[in-house]
Amino acid sequence: MVRRLLALSRPLYWLYEKRLLREVKRGPMPRHLGLILDGNRRYARALGLSPTKGHEFGVQKAYEVLEWCLEMGIKTVTVWVFSTDNFKRPPEEVETLMNLFLREAERMAEDHRILEHQVRVRFIGRREGFSPEVVRAIERLERRTEGHRGMFLNIAMGYGGREEIVDAVKRLLLEAEARGLSPKEVAEGLTPEDIARHLYTAGLPDPDFIIRTSGEIRLSGFLLWQSAYSEFYFADVLWPEFRKIDFLRALRSYQARERRFGR
C-alpha cells in the first residue's frame, strides 16, 4: 500500500517541481549564493550509519546542488564544508574528512562538469591544519581551473569568519608596513573597503543569499563581514535530504523579499 502511494505521488511531485522551476526561473537570481552544509552526521545517525557515510552522502548532494546552481545561472557560490572548529572533532573523523577532501579535490580536477561549465574553484580558509597531500591537491585544482569564467565556486575549508577578518587585518598591516606607513597613518585612513579588499573573497560580490540546512538558525561565523546585507533562509532538512524542491522554494523566498541595504 505504501509503495503504491509513493508510486502515485511521484508524477505529482515531478509536476510540482517543473511548475516551481518555471516560476523561479522568471525571477531574479542571487549573484552570490552561500551554502552552509549542515546535518551530515545527524542524517547518518538517524539511519544507524557511521559519520563517514553521512559525509559521503553530503559530498554527493553538494555535486547535485552545484548542478542546480548552474541550471539557474548563479554565478558565484560559496560552500562551507569544514570550519576551524571542526578540527576539534574526534581524530578518526577528522582523518576521514581529510581523506575525503583529498579524494574529491583530485576528482574535481578532472570532473567533466567543472571543465565543461568552466567552473573556477578556489579554496578559502586557513590551510595550516591540512596535510601536505591535501594542500597540493587543492592547489592543483585551483591552478587547473584558474582560467575558467563560467562560475566561481569557493570552497570554505579550515574556515572561520573571525579568522578571516583577523587574516585580512594582518595582510593589510603587513602591506602598509611594506609601504612605510606608520600605525597611526593606517588607522587614520582605514575604511571598510580596505578590509574588504583583503578578505578571502576579495574581488567577488558579497553574498546576496545564504541558505543553511538542518534547521539550525544561526550563521556560526560564515562570511561574517560579507553577509551584512545578505538575505537568509534556514531549511528544516538535513543537508543530504535537501531536495531540488527545497532549493527552488528557497530561491522563491529570496525573490519575494525587498532588499533595502539599510536604506
Curated annotation (Swiss-Prot):
* Keyword RNA-binding among UniProt keywords: no
> What family is this protein classified in?
Belongs to the UPP synthase family.
Query: Which keywords are on file for this protein?
Result: Magnesium, Metal-binding, Transferase
What CDD domains does the database record attribute to this sequence?
Cis_IPPS (cd00475)
EC number(s) on file: 2.5.1.-
What lineage, starting at the top, does this entry show?
Bacteria, Thermotogati, Deinococcota, Deinococci, Thermales
Q: What is this protein called?
A: Isoprenyl transferase
Its cofactor is: Mg(2+)
Q: Which residues form a coiled coil?
A: none
Q: Where does substrate bind?
A: 39-42, 55, 83-85, 87, 89, 212, 218-220
Which Gene Ontology BP annotations are present? polyprenol biosynthetic process
Instruction: Tell me the organism.
Output: Thermus thermophilus (strain ATCC 27634 / DSM 579 / HB8)
Report the NCBIfam families cross-referenced here.
PRK14835.1, uppS
Quote any Pfam family the record assigns.
Prenyltransf
Q: What does the record note on quaternary structure?
A: Homodimer.
Question: Looking at the record's lineage, which domain of life comes first?
Answer: Bacteria
HAMAP family found in the cross-reference section: ISPT
Magnesium found in the keyword field: yes
GO molecular function, a single term: ditrans,polycis-polyprenyl diphosphate synthase [(2E,6E)-farnesyl diphosphate specific] activity
Using the UniProt record, name the top-level EC class of this enzyme in a single word. Answer: transferase
The protein's role, per its UniProt record: Catalyzes the condensation of isopentenyl diphosphate (IPP) with allylic pyrophosphates generating different type of terpenoids.
In this protein, the active site sits at 38, 86 (proton acceptor)
Chain residues that bind Mg(2+) = 38, 231
Q: How is the cofactor bound?
A: Binds 2 magnesium ions per subunit.
The UniProt entry, under Gene3D superfamilies, shows: Decaprenyl diphosphate synthase-like
